[in-house]
Amino acid sequence: GARAEVSADQVATVMWDYFSQLSSNAKEAVEHLQKSELTQQLNALFQDKLGEVNTYAGDLQKKLVPFATELHERLAKDSKKLKEEIRKELEEVRARLLPHANEVSQKIGENVRELQQRLEPYTDQLRTQVNTQTEQLRRQLTPYAQRMERVLRENADSLQTSLRPHADQLKAKIDQNVEELKGRLTPYADEFKVKIDQTVEELRRSLAPYAQDAQEKLNHQLEGLAFQMKKNAEELKARISASAEELRQRLAPLAEDMRGNLRGNTEGLQKSLAELGGHLDRHVEEFRLRVEPYGENFNKALVQQMEQLRQKLGPHAGDVEGHLSFLEKDLRDKVNSFFSTFKEKESQDNTLSLPEPEQQQEQQQEQEQQQEQQEEQQQQEQQQEQEQQQEQVQMLAPLES
């Protein structure tokens, strides 16, 4: 089966959340850093995601914790320095753009409008899908409640036998539909990421003529913007997924209660069944109302981030805490790199040392192949011998006559 894993993204999120909690601008991060606390949080993540630790996870955990602690300390120390670097970078970019302040502001404004136009169809589709999928979920589940009520009326004498399959089917249907729901809704976040890349690239091209020799520094600022915007897309995906799981957790006990009530009296079961349809409807509707605005809120957040960039690059920028997103990007890049290296090394090690049963199997296969080759070689040698003997017989035949 598929191996449960702790991802680079989950580890980076734990680290960044902890880093952010220490101080809003990480000034006092070094003083407050508690190695043991970060270690506990990472260990808790492994425990939560994997339950019992397998060899792979144990090895990863052993190597990851010292790496994470060291990276955390470095980030805390680099924070002040990076803040100063970003401030200088912004000053230089602003100085280059200042003579064209109105045009730059106008170009960013045009990009904001283009971004909204790009995202609008997807936001509408997401909203439509939320409504369609929740309606479908309701249509799929309601008949089970009605069917069970009918079975109750018709088979009062043999309730357990008659109703249990329906209760089991309801549980399976809930799981299946929630998975389908997630499968339909979460891909929108990836579509949004593609649109973000297009928008930022167009913005880079439209601002390039004004940046002159500060082009590289402007590109760096735009990388920071793209990172923040894509992070929003990831959060949207996580939020949809979490809401779908929450819906499953609210619906699943309804099926469990039905199965439990089969052992009780008919009156209690009748009451539960009468309420089942209403409960299903209510939970599905709550999910719809909660998730429906997600797309629109996501759009607003992206527009706000573009507006913040316009402010940062404008003549009246003020003091902006712009370095933290770069710090987070650096952290996530380093954690991703650590995971890639670890997985690469693990796959190399696996080819060298397979688990015992696999090793034995491989050895057995090798032995069988060697045996086959030996037998083949023997047959060839025998054949050659026979051919040589026949040749000798043919050569001697004229002499004998």
Swiss-Prot record:
Gene Ontology MF, one: phosphatidylcholine-sterol O-acyltransferase activator activity
Keywords: Chylomicron, HDL, Lipid transport, Phosphoprotein, Repeat, Secreted, Signal, Transport
Gene Ontology cellular-component terms listed: chylomicron; extracellular vesicle; high-density lipoprotein particle; low-density lipoprotein particle; very-low-density lipoprotein particle
Compartment annotation: Secreted
SUPFAM superfamilies the UniProt entry points to: Apolipoprotein A-I
Annotated stretches, region: 13 X 22 AA approximate tandem repeats: 17-314
GO-annotated biological processes: acylglycerol homeostasis; cholesterol efflux; cholesterol metabolic process; lipoprotein metabolic process; phospholipid efflux
Intervals holding Sequence repeats: 17-38, 44-65, 66-87, 99-120, 121-142, 143-164, 165-186, 187-208, 209-230, 231-252, 253-270, 271-292, 293-314
Signal peptide, first to last residue: 1-4
Record bears the keyword Secreted: yes
Keyword NAD part of the UniProt annotation: no
Tissue expression remark: Synthesized primarily in the intestine and secreted in plasma.
Domain of life: Eukaryota
Comment on protein domains: Nine of the thirteen 22-amino acid tandem repeats (each 22-mer is actually a tandem array of two, A and B, related 11-mers) occurring in this sequence are predicted to be highly alpha-helical, and many of these helices are amphipathic. They may therefore serve as lipid-binding domains with lecithin:cholesterol acyltransferase (LCAT) activating abilities.
Subunit record text: Homodimer.
Family: Belongs to the apolipoprotein A1/A4/E family.
Name of this protein: Apolipoprotein A-IV
